[in-house]
Amino acid sequence: VILRGQIFDIERFRPTESGETASPLSPEELDEYTYLVAGSVGEFWTRICCQHILGYTSKSLEDLLPVARRFGQALQLVNILRDRRSDADIGRVYIPDQRFYAEMEHVGELLTAGDEYTASVVPRMLRAACLLPLDLARRTLALVAEHPLGERVKVPRYIVWFALIRAMIFKEEIQIDLIREKQ
């Protein structure tokens, strides 16, 4: 599946002899692309963890797979939004400017799947491993929102370290907060 996503990317954005760039992805193509390169990864690791880690989740595999898919897609969409100018410079326009705000809203909705997924992970260290990319994605998205013209943004290294420590130390408290918010 991941290879299909990479092939899709290469073929879709192949340079033409005339030097024209490909049109931006449609919302449907973007959904397919983010599934192929990231949503499928969420499904894959969820299957592996459910099969090999006793008590991995409080949900059934059937219920968790669509959540894993959306969580993976959300993380990829954050990267696409973050890199949209540098990607455009090399002829890859995943999201046209006129859809920027709609996709910012959409990725915010998709990230709630990360909350749901993380809340369902039982082993504390694995829960922390889910919290870290979720936290960094939200921080990155906030920076992207502050720079809507597409300037390259990056979460500072000290914030990354802070997020790592926060995920490791406060994993139970964060989970309790997430569960309370859902009720």
Predicted segment positions?
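Catalytic cores of Mg2+-dependent Asp-rich isoprenoid enzymes
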Residues: 1-74, 81-183
